[in-house]
Amino acid sequence: MEKLPTQIFKFAQVFSTSHKRDIEKIFSDNEFETKNSLPILTWDFIYRDIVNTARANDLTSPSMDMGALWTARGVIIEGILYVFMMKRRFEDVIDKYEKHHYLTCIARSKNSHLNGKEDNKLSTELFNDLDDDELSNSQIEQAKKLLGNHYNSIDEIRVVTFDKKTKEVTVNQVNAFCEFIDAVNITEFDFSELEEDGRENSPEKPLVALKSGVQKQLESQMHVSLPFEKREENGK
């Protein structure tokens, strides 16, 4: 993966910020007896921070409407759409090749230039999907609906993941069939030297940010192995 844009580190910082206190206050103030909305509230805070950071840096944050229950936000930097997922969910999507997941659809329409760069061979099932024109057309049409007017301004999609256990933020690259290509760990940064960039919220517990010597870091980025290759939860 070529040198990453500096702005992505700002999004790594807001993506890894904990909103536990904010969410607990919502439950407490409303005297909720259950916490069914916890995952949704967590992502609402994350997407708010992503949108605010995009606005503060004059970047576009597309809204991807997936129906009544879920809307995702990403950010376009230099023609690349970065979407945000928890690491375990990302691994599930590419392991199982969830054919109609939004990541699968957008990757199918935007990442064909990366085909052939994967390390592993295609599974028989995935190989059969290569010849499924109906599926491919369906995925591309879905991608066009999700991205709307932003579709033609996007050249590639990458996935920024957050590992809840290790607190690591990683930028992942996949081909058109969501086969893993490359990953760069962007966690090791000093929060004290990152500008707030006009975000309206104050982070409760920032975990990553930009070091003063970030340019050196960018020029020799640390590549990581296949994200699901060594996961501890495999098979559980």
Describe the role of every protein-language-model region:
Residues M1-L41:
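Interdomain/boundary linker segments immediately adjacent to catalytic/signaling cores
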Residues I46-A56:
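Short, contiguous, helix-prone interaction/anchoring segments in small proteins
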Residues P39, W43, Y47, R88:
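Nuclease catalytic cores
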Residues A54-F84:
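A short acidic/basic microdomain associated with nuclease active sites
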Residues N52-T53, S63, L147-Y151:
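Short, solvent-exposed secondary-structure boundary motifs
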